[in-house]
Amino acid sequence: YFDFLNQSNLEKEIGEALIFLFIDQIRDLKNANEPYPTSLRGINWVKFLSVHEIEKKSFDRYLYSQYRILLDQIEYHLLGNHLLENGFSLIFGGYYFKGSELYQKGKELVSIELREQILNDGAHFELSPMYHKILLQRLLDTYNLVKNNKDVYQDAIFEKLLRDTGKKMLSWLESITFSNGTTPRVNDSTEGISSESSELFDYAKRLGFEWELAELSDSGYRLFKGAAVELFVDYGKIGPSYIPGHAHSDTFSFILNYKGSPVIVDPGISTYNIGYRRQRERSTSSHNTVRYGKVDQSEVWGGFRVGRRAKAVITNESADSIKGYHCGYKRFGIYHQRVFNFNQTSITIEDNMVAKNQLLGKSSAYFHFHPGIEVKIEKNRILVDGCNLNFSGASSTRIKEYTYAHGYNDTEKAKLVEVIFRERLVTEITLNDVKAN
């Protein structure tokens, strides 16, 4: 992708040498000519060559040939963030080469896909905070390019689309960013890939963006904030329906931060390689929600595919509570209903397995703790640093080990609690050393 070209301490000569080396070895690089890496690499090369005012015909010839190939290989078959990246890159190529065909095609793609992919509350429709931040940065870069190069192309309508969409995306991002600056690691999200929220906010402000916090809606994500505790809940749908490749089987999962530190966490992702680890990281039991028997809510398979899927419905919500159900176990005649009630000193979670007929089998509720947190069990009570968990309706409770992913190929063992129940489970999380206002 050549993202390293954007490093402030990278010497111009080293960047040039690496570009030369890449061009020389391109025939041996199996995936380098795929449209997605070509798109990202093109943007990074244009930025690097422009910032350093490098004019080399060999670079330009190769880069232009790559853009001609990209024009014929736009990723209509993959759609989603790939198609937006194709469009953004073609716009950069159009400005760099003053090529109307590149620019017009890129503008067409971006105009159509922004309207398709950005939800009403500002979330990117793949519902991954990581990809949301990546695409927001790309949008800000494109807005910067369009705004400051009107001698090349000028389109007030397109500029306004970028500005208005950017405001919505910034608003959503601020609404789901924790006080410690991190974002929820839901669906395919992990650290060290995208820019931090604060970096994007600062960049947007330098470009003249102003935005207000909007109410979270379509994404299904909610973030409850107290003086010392933050509770993120996921009542979103598998999204989008026609390309759910980055979705997990995680309906009604949640994340709990206490005094700015993670306590109950999403285990995250460590690989995109299709296999056991990828399957496990997308499964219901790898999230803080309920699994009926040994069945996932949504049938994740093949690394990036989803079969039958849970559809979440929010039935009631307020400033400190949310209630809903999903149909992921409909084929067994069961609906899972989950209610969160939030206040400054405690959180109550009520799970009901609503059956049309007699309920057969048991369910498991999972609670994954951040590495380093000591977890102790006392009857139906869990003791951890910062909070206690009490369970009503549990058949049994046990502590298990799981693999927490700090990032790609970077994992660590941690503790989880599995609570077995039949029809109804009430979990009360009591926060220590917190006084009600």
Region spans (language model):
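Aromatic-lined, polymer-binding surfaces characteristic
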Residues: 1-166
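CBM-like, beta-strand-rich accessory domains located in the C-terminal region of large
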Residues: 272-437
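A residue-level signal for conserved active-site and pocket-lining positions in enzyme catalytic cores
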Residues: 4, 90, 173, 351, ...
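Short, solvent-exposed loop/turn segments at the edges of secondary structure
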Residues: 85, 247-251, 285-287
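Carbohydrate-active enzyme catalytic cores, enriched for enzymes
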Residues: 123-269, 313-317, 323
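Short alpha-helix boundary/capping segments
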Residues: 33, 38, 244, 248, ...
